[in-house]
């Protein structure tokens, strides 16, 4: 049986959690008003936030970045930066719209593969109404620890060797769990490697035109945009 360690949150951590949830709800509001589906994921969904936690509102599906940007602009949200990122040649390219340090929105620019979609459930994800309700869900953190919320904090346990059990608990396929275990264990051994592609956009550029431009010289990206 896996060793389970209980973590009890102090008042400061609960205050941080509640403040970040309010901020996430405000960030999601412009998208909800435009009927754009969105998720909060990671530590914000699980509850194990820290001072270094980010708020990345993820927009699933292949929503037009132009429509997303227009929805944000209507509510006075101004980006501080925008970029296209493709982590590896095989991964989906994504648009990132930053609004402050450790705050922003992301959306895929190509159709996601099943394991890419399931990553968000693997990490723990919730919808806007669940953000507002204070719901916390189980998920796996960057240490490959399964985080299971409790009334006073959470219980954490190792994922390695329990991939099937964890997949069942999170409602995801075994492949995403095995893939993340391989990726994170390799990262532990060799360190974090740089991303395959990162292209910062100027205020005048659109995501669609830059993606089209990049795909002309990047075969791996071009294959994912077909």
Feature locations, PLM:
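Catalytic core of pol beta-like nucleotidyltransferases
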Residues: 1-37, 45-51, 61-226
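Short loop/edge segments at beta-strand edges and connector loops
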Residues: 42
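Charged, often glycine-rich, active-site loop that binds/positions anionic groups
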Residues: 54
């Amino acid at each position: 049986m896996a060793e389970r360690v209980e973590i009890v949150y102090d008042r400061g951590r609960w205050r941080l959690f509640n403040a970040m949830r309010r901020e996430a709800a405000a960030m999601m509001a412009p998208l909800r008003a435009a009927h754009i589906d969105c998720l909060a994921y990671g530590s914000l969904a699980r509850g194990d936030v820290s001072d270094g936690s980010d708020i990345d509102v993820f927009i699933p599906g292949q929503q037009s970045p132009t429509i997303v940007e227009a929805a944000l602009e209507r509510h006075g949200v101004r980006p501080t930066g925008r970029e296209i990122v493709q982590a590896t040649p095989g991964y989906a390219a994504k648009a990132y719209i930053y609004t402050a340090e450790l705050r922003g929105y992301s959306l895929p620019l190509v159709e996601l593969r099943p394991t890419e979609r399931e990553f968000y459930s693997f990490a723990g994800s919730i919808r806007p109404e669940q953000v507002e309700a204070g719901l916390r869900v189980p998920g796996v953190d960057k240490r490959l620890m399964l985080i299971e919320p409790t009334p006073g904090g959470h219980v954490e346990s190792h994922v390695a060797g329990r991939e099937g059990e964890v997949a069942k608990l999170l409602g995801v396929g075994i492949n995403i769990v095995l893939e993340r275990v391989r990726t994170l264990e390799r990262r532990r051994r060799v360190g974090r490697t740089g991303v395959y592609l990162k292209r910062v956009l100027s205020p005048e550029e659109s995501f669609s035109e830059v993606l089209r431009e990049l795909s002309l010289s990047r075969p791996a990206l071009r294959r994912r945009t077909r």
